[in-house]
Amino acid sequence: MHKKRNHKRHILIILLTFILIGVAGVFITINREQIIDEWDWLTIKSEQKMDVPIENQLPEYPNGCEVTALSMLLNYYHVDVTKRTLARNIKHVPSFEGGKYMGNPHKGFVGYMTIANAGWCVYNEPLYDVAHKYTNRIRNYTGHSFIQVMKLVSDGHPIMIISTLKFKRVNDMQTWDTHQGKVKVTPSSHACVITGYNKKKLIVYVNNPYGKKNQAVSWKDLEASFNQQGKQALYMK
């Protein structure tokens, strides 16, 4: 009888141990990103500003902010490519497919870059694919938090992100039905290259594809737009 009680006690202890390990695992998973973010905030430099060459998407590409931003990023690292080459070689998809579905910016640029009001946007995957044709140093950093993005900027890496025209959260997000499923899109979608920041002032510097070099924007507003647009980012290793 005594042996049976001990056996049951051992089983109970083992079960409790597994439960505690499981709870701890969930806690660690939930808080891992927060811990990384807090560490990155503590360790980034007080300020940074890089001399990334500025380009203007106009007049050739009224809807070509993404390839223009990507061209700026690649040219900073002396990759011999132009926005025209990128625009020509990135995958394109029609705005409407089969009369029922919208084009998917995760698959290619939706519409026309060269015709005002006839094009939409393109997301990280086609941008990565076209950049990879010219350099194997390109990295897709999509899904990382904004502070992790800024840690790379602190370390001397300009980063291209998908934001919005005014670099702040918008209220005109749409949900498109595409062949691959539902996709969030805004007519205010806009790309830029983060070139630096001032940590104390909570200012981020961006190269705006409308020809504005090191434009100062609100850190919090840019972060909000970055999150709303799916945390899409590319940089060079």
Regions flagged by a language model, labelled:
Residues 173-181, 185-186, 193-237:
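Noncatalytic regulatory segments and standalone regulatory/sensor domains
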